């Protein structure tokens, strides 16, 4: 994981939850951690690791992830043992 990924990880865990994190940066972070990204129908994306799964939809308008998406990513990372 490089310094850009580390900054994104810190932003995901920041309080209050940010709504200005670019979705692409979140995807790159998850892939850098070793999480498998599976493209589904439409804008649906699944992230898989250690028998855990996170299903999300890519944002349609704008490139920033919604707060609930950032919280879901944060919960998933905690579940698989990743912390900043």
Where are the model-predicted features located?
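Basic nucleic-acid-binding interfaces
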Residues: 1-84
């Amino acid at each position: 994981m490089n310094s850009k990924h580390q900054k994104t990880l810190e932003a995901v865990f920041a309080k209050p939850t940010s709504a200005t994190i670019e979705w692409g940066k979140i995807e790159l972070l998850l892939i850098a951690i070793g999480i498998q990204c599976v493209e589904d129908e439409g804008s649906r994306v699944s992230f898989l690791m250690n028998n855990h799964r996170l299903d999300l939809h890519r944002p349609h308008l704008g490139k920033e992830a919604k707060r609930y998406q950032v919280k879901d990513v944060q919960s998933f990372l905690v579940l698989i043992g990743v912390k900043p």
